[in-house]
Amino acid sequence: MSGPSPTYVTFDTSVGSFTVELYTAHAPKTCNNFAKLAERGYYNGVIFHRIIPNFMIQGGDPTGTGRGGTSIYGDRFADEIHPELRFVGAGILAMANSGPNTNGSQFFITCAPTPYLDGKHTIFGRVSSGMKTIQRLEAVRTDKDDRPVEEIKIHRARLGDATQGGGLAVAMPA
């Protein structure tokens, strides 16, 4: 996944759009998984099933339970922990997991520094535009299980350029 331009994925959600830049040099397998899932429409119609203010928003599970989702490599794949990447602030994109080497399709975006997650989750990108949308997501009302009271959906996830609404196709290896 080398090339002159970074890879971006734009999410159109119930509360607005945001774009993430993928760290293909640091987590190539994870970025390929995420981009391919987006390209295939896997995330379209999926909800953000867990939102915790001052911590993170989580989505990517087509069952909406927090227990589902698979990768393009099969059920699960290995972590790509990179020592240079740390949970230093809001807007960091990482894989949700249930322990080491259990990555599938679920991801989360931080809403604050979370250094206690360093070395436990693969960081593979950052929000490059649309942090206001992330803040709107963070502010939705949730129940006792951190699930939004009203469903917040990903209407569409697409590969593109860095601009909001960009539709420039980016080639991804198989």
From Swiss-Prot:
Q: Which family does it belong to?
A: Belongs to the cyclophilin-type PPIase family. PPIL1 subfamily.
Return the InterPro entries for the record: Cyclophilin-like_dom_sf, Cyclophilin-type_PPIase, Cyclophilin-type_PPIase_CS, Cyclophilin-type_PPIase_dom, Cyclophilin_A-like
Domain of life from the UniProt record: Eukaryota
Q: What is its EC number?
A: 5.2.1.8
Q: What organism does the record attribute this protein to?
A: Cryptococcus neoformans var. neoformans serotype D (strain JEC21 / ATCC MYA-565)
Q: Which reaction does it catalyse?
A: [protein]-peptidylproline (omega=180) = [protein]-peptidylproline (omega=0)
- Which Pfam families does its entry note? Pro_isomerase (PF00160)
Biological process according to GO = mRNA cis splicing, via spliceosome; mRNA splicing, via spliceosome; protein folding
Role description: PPIases accelerate the folding of proteins. It catalyzes the cis-trans isomerization of proline imidic peptide bonds in oligopeptides.
One CC-aspect GO term = post-mRNA release spliceosomal complex
PROSITE patterns (alphabetical): CSA_PPIASE_1 (PS00170), CSA_PPIASE_2 (PS50072)
In alphabetical order, the GO MF annotations are: peptidyl-prolyl cis-trans isomerase activity
Q: What is this protein called?
A: Peptidyl-prolyl cis-trans isomerase-like 1
Q: Could you list this entry's UniProt keywords, alphabetically sorted.
A: Isomerase, Rotamase
